Amino acid sequence: GSEMCIRDRPDTFDPKSSKRNFKLSLGDVSEGRVLPFIMKEIYADSKNISVGSFAYQRSDQVHALATNNLDFVVDPIIPRSDEINSEKVFEDDFVVMYREGHDLSKIKDVSVDDILDQKHLHVSNRRRGLHLIDTELEKIGYRREVALRCQHFLIAPTIIQSTDLVLMGTRSFANRNNLPFAEIPLDIPSMEYFLIWHKNDEGDGGHIWMKDLIVRAFKHAQR
């Protein structure tokens, strides 16, 4: 049908000449994980392709995908809809990170008590967002002392490096920011991230190309 003219058939999509704009909804941490990799690849091979990353409420994601306002969503939660497909692209577990030379770095097997003796940095952009970690701690009757609560992960490394605050966050975040860390001796569920797209986009050449690039970007971040 005429729909096909708007989108690229697999045999007509050429990343080298395409001027397509891909619209993604990634969230703060995923942006940091994959956008540098994606843009490096695009810059090397497909200079006319552009990418936008937008924040969408979960309740608006499916509609945005259905109306081509979004090409892909990356989220820990898969929306309930039979219009979409998804694939797990990333799994990350939690560690406690700190500055070089921190007291925790001198302890061989860090215990939950050792971690909770510290003052914590807590990152959350939800007004009352209870973190996965706090939920697990509460189950065993523990609470952490939060000395600073901020909204964005961007400033976390600077604060950790220049104070004695510790941060419970993902292993990949610690690795990417060269922050020393210790394992948390608790059974905390790991974070899973899913790549989510609309079924109507399958078979579209540009969509196939971008999906492959996003999957590779997450594989690269998992290292």
Identify what each model region corresponds to.
Residues S81-H120, G205-I208:
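Flexible hinge/capping segments at coil-to-helix
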Residues N21-S25, V73, M97, L121, ...:
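Short, well-ordered beta-strand segments
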Residues S17-S81, C150:
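Central regulatory/effector-binding core of bacterial HTH transcription factors
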Residues G1-I6:
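Short, small-residue-biased leader/transition segments that mark boundaries at the very start
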Residues Q57-L70, P76, R126-P180:
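Hydrophobic hinge/microswitch elements
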Residues D82-K88, D92, Q151-E202:
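Beta-alpha-beta core module
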Residues L104-S105, Q118-I140, G203-K211, A221:
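Secondary-structure junction motif
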Residues K23-S25, F94, V110-L130, F218:
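Short loop->beta-strand "edge-of-pocket" segments that line small-molecule binding or catalytic clefts
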